[in-house]
């Protein structure tokens, strides 16, 4: 029966069977996934990337290059300005004990990006891939806090849909009440604010819970005590003042590179100090859309007389009326106007 059924096959089906018989006994190449190990890019150095592989692999950090095919795809698509960024989840083909080749890059779930410093054209420079949140550290005093710098970063974070927590360090210098007088406005519009003192250990437990098993962008002006705060998170850390920036090899905001710094609690807890906070650009935000990233304006902007109201000079503006009533903080509104007019 079987033989007669074979005889009734079409010539095309017979050719297919012969092809399968010819090649079915040949050794098959291994599936790509069996040769690859998963990891996260913790540092970028030119065309080389330090990849920390997942627990259980032979080598936790490998120096990797990118597969030529991926580079060719980037050249063909000029819109892909940053092929591999710190924070990217990648798949690496090991090469020896310490090296590897990046074969695949997982899709990013979030990014923190900016205009390339010194470049006037629109170009996306991904500072960090897949961040979970941002921690903006300011000091209550020494140095004096400049909230317009904070407002500018909050716009960038809102645009990137990046949850942000504000940490106010050095409250031992002013007292909590004085710090709240400056930063309480951010609590009132929905931001979480942690009042801390590295000197007295206040607010440390809140910070630890905030960071566990997350990739956190840590940023803020120089001298606000970022390293001192991190020292208090775990007794195994012994960073001196400035050591965090030295560890990240960034000097004083002189490079665009970032690096993930693993913390010794949780399974995948990383912090990343972002370089060049003063160079963060609002390059991809149309001025008319800036209002969407000042969260306190949202409940008022729909009540403006003109649908395209910029909340600057137009009559019957509900946002300006809210400022006059004190419902919107005047300093925040002034920050909005400065950004609206490009006075960064």
Regions found by a protein language model. Name each.
Residues 148-158:
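Histidine-anchored nucleotide/phosphate-binding helix
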Residues 173-224:
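Canonical P-loop GTPase G-domain recognition
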Residues 39-41, 102:
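Conserved hydrophobic positions within beta-strands
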Residues 97-106, 144-145:
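Short, Lys/Arg- and Gly-enriched loop/turn segments at beta-strand edges
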Residues 1-7, 17, 32-35, 47, ...:
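Helix-rich effector regions associated with P-loop NTPase G domains
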Residues 131-138, 160-169, 190-196:
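Conserved beta-strand/loop subsegment of P-loop NTPase cores
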Residues 227:
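Walker A/P-loop
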